[in-house]
Amino acid sequence: LNYGFRNQDMKGNLSGYYLYNPKKLSSVSLGMGSDFGFVNNFATFADILNRSNFFVQKYVTATHRTELFNGFYSGANVRRTTRSDLGDFEFNPSFDSAFSNNNPQRFKSSALVIASVGISYTPKQLYIQEPKEKIVIGSKFPTFQLYYSQAIAGVLGSKASFKELDFSINQKFNVGIFGQSEYTVSLGGFLDTSKLQIMDY
């Protein structure tokens, strides 16, 4: 948690995690928080820190994950987020002056309810089976993930409506005395764009 004296506001995140079946790595987690989001995560450095690229978001989320067989996992997540513009939020004056046209974007506050389901698979995942738990060691193969997400309109004030499919490949590997490295390759797209806000792209 952190508190901003200039704007007298509190930001932060709170989460809880419960591993209810250690042998199948089955878990549930809950989270909530208030922080800043980016309108465009892929903006240039000059634009990504511009006031117009920020918005305020408050969220609650619930996630379930379990292993169906060795290396193959399924997961589901539900998240509700309210998004609003910065309004009269004050930045440090010296920070503001470093950017041109540094005015916050104005838009109506909105709610987003999004449900996601997905699977991931790591071939030949190595593990140790203890009497009461399974300990994953790793694999020399990458992890393949496929996730489907849908924004649900008309639920808990949500007006957004879109569908999205994402596929990714991720792998961590050792590089000797340099420690560990990692790469991720991802692709995806919208299956439906009935109602999107700019930060949903």
Please report, for each region that a protein language model flagged, where it lies by residue.
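Residues that define the transmembrane beta-barrel architecture of outer-membrane proteins
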Residues: 8-12, 54-60, 109-115, 161-165
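C-terminal outer-membrane beta-barrel translocator/porin domains of Gram-negative envelope proteins
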Residues: 27-37, 41-53, 105, 147-201
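Surface-exposed loop/turn segments flanking beta-strands in extracellular/periplasmic regions
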Residues: 23-24, 88-104
